A protein has these predicted regions:
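Compact, charge-rich alpha-helical regulatory domains located at protein termini
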Residues: 502-576
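Class II aminoacyl-tRNA synthetase catalytic cores and aaRS-like
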Residues: 1-505
Length: 576
């Protein structure tokens, strides 16, 4: 018996072989025709109509209650769980009890996939079940699932360790059904947005992920190299510039759900790889986009949750249009954080940050204003459009100057519960102004701003051919999903969030164990028990370790000569 496997893994591999010895393929190639799901049966079964007299379901065994010649097990498919009643005389009609007594009772385990043919009924206790007339092994699980127990509405031994949940999301989805609902809602969010955009006649497009120049945002990019072309390329940080080129090309409205990548920090609301939706519509401005965004989010909230009234971090938030609107100056006055000077918002904005908040790397007034604004607005309880009156060049290099004040930009951001959700402009379409702003970004970069935008001359050339008045909006899908599903971390709305590599302790060589007196044949046994370094033996109580060794030897029928208690004490003692 291979001791590198756990006892359960060994037994399951033995069952795997036994199934094949009986002529049952544990991983059949043929399709299995499913006619109903657990949810469909639960929602549509009618005791008087007997509408599920011939049903085929398939899924994973999640629990079993074996009771002699009849048993129950719980089957889980992608929609939920349903109880299955199985009886020996039903599945073994020719008198050979092997299929029930051996295959079902001994060779199948929790986690295995099976197909069930039978009919729906209610047990004497009223529980909706499927009476199995025939079952098929569809896939054998050779690694046991975590055992999560429920009783009287309480969960015991829950699978909650975030580290394991995020690394093994497939396992998280199996044992925590509520996790799947988060991702079902995420898909609903995106589907509803697509329906909304398509109903307006806008076109979904795809633009390059590998780009020669990373543009459309102020961020640090990931860099890679294309061997065939022998050039460096960047993973995109935004879809903006390519989408605007399509507006130049004659599209009236385009949108893209795109993966963006930013080589920056990670926290509860940021992941280096994230999904963003950007949309650009010709002949519109940022005021139109405000109303458009309100309508979209109201529709999405209703589609996903059936209401526009939500609770986020204990605060009531409404996605019912219209949202509250403030200028940046009004938002700051409301928080009473700084003293304002001048009747117009521009003067107050230009003097926003306190001296100690200035960015000494490149003296970037706009960047410091933005950081301070985030601090000022953090903790707000209502969705609010913010017309950010920010310095033109540093803060909004792709945004049109405000029609009433050339020191400001036509831009808004939507904050929900103190966090930015979306960003929108009246898009800059003056090619000369755009080039000047790119050049200013270059000067900032030379002063040390590693997030300043690159100069994209192809984009400037596109603008020179003429781009109509246009409004654009970008919204983070991950963050929107967090809000609409009540999750506090972005990792909970990503199937496979970015994480550090698993830490793996390197096992000591056999020689390290034999040097302290451990017989060579006992080394793999000790390491299998979890003590993969000599140092780990120092922390053990010799008496208990001795009993564990002898018990492991006997249980697994290894036939090894047991060490004496004194020998074990020597292994566990500090060596000279």
């Amino acid at each position: 018996m291979a001791i590198e496997l756990s006892e359960q893994e060994q037994l399951r591999r033995q069952s795997l072989k036994a199934l094949r010895d009986l002529g049952i393929e544990p991983y059949p190639a043929a399709r299995y025709e499913v006619t109903a799901t657990a949810r469909e049966i639960a929602e549509n079964y009618d005791d008087t109509k007997h509408n599920y007299d011939d049903v085929r379901i398939a899924g994973r065994i999640m629990s079993r209650r074996i009771m002699g010649s009849a048993s129950f097990f719980e089957l889980q498919d992608h929609t939920g769980r349903i109880q299955v009643y199985i009886r020996r005389d039903d599945i073994c009609p020719e008198g050979d009890p092997t299929l029930y007594n051996t295959v079902f009772k001994k060779l199948l385990d929790i986690g295995d996939f099976v197909g069930v043919e039978g009919f729906a009924f209610r047990t004497n206790t009223g529980e909706l079940s499927v009476h199995c007339k025939r079952f098929t092994v569809l896939s054998k699980s050779i690694r046991p699932l975590p055992v999560v127990k429920e009783k009287d509405g309480k969960t015991f031994d829950a699978f909650t360790d975030p580290e394991i949940r995020y690394r093994q999301r497939y396992l998280d989805l199996i044992v925590n059904p509520q996790v799947k609902e988060v991702f079902v809602k995420r898909a609903k969010i995106m589907a509803t947005m697509r329906e909304f955009f398509n109903s307006k006649g806008y076109i979904e497009v795809e633009t390059p992920i590998l780009q020669p120049i990373p543009g459309g945002a102020s961020a640090r990019p990931f860099i890679t190299h294309h061997n065939s072309l022998d050039i460096d390329l960047y993973l995109r940080i935004a879809t903006e510039l390519y989408l605007k080129k399509l507006i130049v090309g004659g599209f009236d409205g385009v949108y893209e759900f795109g993966k963006n990548f930013r080589n920056e920090g990670m926290d509860r609301t940021h992941n280096p790889e994230f999904t963003c939706m950007e949309i650009y519509v010709a002949y519109k401005d940022y005021r139109w986009m405000m109303e458009f965004t309100e309508q979209m989010l109201e529709r999405v909230s209703m589609a996903v949750n059936g209401t526009t009234e939500l609770e986020i971090d204990g605060r009531k938030v409404s996605f019912k249009a219209p949202f509250r609107r403030l200028t940046m100056t009004d938002a700051i006055r409301e928080k009473d954080r700084i003293r304002h000077h001048g009747p117009d918002g521009g003067a107050a904005a230009r003097g926003l940050q306190a001296p100690e908040r200035r960015d000494r790397r490149h003296d970037g007034q706009g960047q410091t204003d933005r950081r301070h604004l985030r601090t000022v607005l953090r903790g707000g309880a209502h969705p609010a459009h913010l017309r950010l009156r920010l310095p033109i060049i540093e803060m909004s290099p792709l945004c049109k100057r405000h029609r009433d004040n050339q020191d400001l930009t036509e831009r808004f951001e939507l904050f929900v519960n103190g966090k930015e959700l979306c960003n929108a402009y009246s898009e800059l379409n003056d090619p000369i102004d755009q080039l000047e702003r790119f050049q200013e970004q270059l000067r900032l970069s030379e002063k040390g701003d590693d997030e300043a935008m690159f100069i994209d001359m192809d984009f400037v050339r596109a603008l020179e051919y003429g781009m109509p008045t246009c409004s654009g909006m970008g919204i983070g899908i991950d963050r929107l999903t967090m809000f609409l599903t009540g999750q506090s971390s972005i990792q909970d709305v990503l199937f496979f969030p970015q994480m550090r590599p698993e830490k793996k302790v390197v096992a000591d060589p056999v020689e390290a164990y034999t040097a302290i007196g451990v017989p060579e044949e006992w080394v793999p046994v000790i390491q299998k028990m979890g003590y993969i370094t000599v140092e780990s033996l120092r922390k053990l109580a010799p008496g208990k370790f001795f009993n564990d060794l002898c018990g492991f030897n006997k249980k697994n029928k290894l036939g090894l000569k047991a060490p004496s208690i004194d020998e074990v004490k020597a292994w566990c003692s500090e060596q000279e």
